[in-house]
Curated annotation (Swiss-Prot):
Keywords: Activator, DNA-binding, Early protein, Host cytoplasm, Host nucleus, Host-virus interaction, Inhibition of host innate immune response by virus, Metal-binding, Modulation of host cell apoptosis by virus, Transcription, Transcription regulation, Viral immunoevasion, Zinc, Zinc-finger. Belongs to the papillomaviridae E6 protein family. SUPFAM superfamilies: E6 C-terminal domain-like. GO terms for biological process: DNA-templated transcription; regulation of DNA-templated transcription; symbiont-mediated perturbation of host apoptosis; symbiont-mediated perturbation of host ubiquitin-like protein modification; symbiont-mediated suppression of host innate immune response; symbiont-mediated suppression of host type I interferon-mediated signaling pathway. Forms homodimers. Interacts with ubiquitin-protein ligase UBE3A/E6-AP; this interaction stimulates UBE3A ubiquitin activity. Interacts with host BAK1. Plays a major role in the induction and maintenance of cellular transformation. E6 associates with host UBE3A/E6-AP ubiquitin-protein ligase and modulates its activity. Protects host keratinocytes from apoptosis by mediating the degradation of host BAK1. May also inhibit host immune response. A zinc finger (unnamed) spans 34-71, 108-144. Pfam families: E6. It is found in: Host cytoplasm; Host nucleus. One of its GO terms (cellular component) is host cell nucleus. This is Protein E6. The gene is E6. Its main location: host cell. HAMAP family: HPV_E6.
Length: 148
């Protein structure tokens, strides 16, 4: 069995690191196009892709796509503008969801990074808002919160 056949028989990699490991090549040598603009992700964007806990997009033809920083920001803005539902202040998100904040999936409203517990608690501590957008929760990550 050829290496490509072995790769195709496995579940498709979800992260940039998994893809590099599967192909047995250095991460820096990966060429992954953005799903929206088709520009190849830079090395920094490849690292950030996994840091943000995003997942690779696979087509039926076994083509793989990622999401560049520019398109992530543009997509997040479009989504927030057109699909905003409501906002809650800090810890009120637990009441709305009926579970502890650590169990709630919240992504950054600007870059789509999955927020960690410290980022979620910082939002609560500062009495800032979480936003329900397209049936998902959004907040601010450390980086975007420091830029805003």
């Amino acid at each position: 069995m050829y290496l490509t056949e072995q790769i195709m028989d496995r579940p498709k990699p979800r992260t940039v690191k998994e893809l590099a490991d599967t192909l047995v090549i250095p991460l820096i040598d990966l060429l992954i196009p953005c799903k929206f603009c088709n520009r190849f992700l830079s090395y920094f964007e490849l690292l950030n892709f996994d840091h943000k806990c995003l997942q690779l997009i696979w087509t039926e033809e076994d083509l793989v796509y990622g999401l560049c920083s520019s398109c992530a920001y543009a997509s997040a803005q479009l989504e927030f503008t057109h699909f905003f539902q409501f906002a809650v202040v800090g810890k009120d998100i637990e009441t709305v969801e009926g579970t502890a904040i650590g169990n709630i999936c919240i992504r950054c409203r600007y870059c789509f990074k999955l927020l960690d517990l410290v980022e979620k608690l910082a939002t609560c501590y500062k009495f800032e808002q979480f936003y329900k957008v397209r049936n998902s929760w959004k907040g601010l990550c450390r980086h975007c919160g420091s830029v805003e």
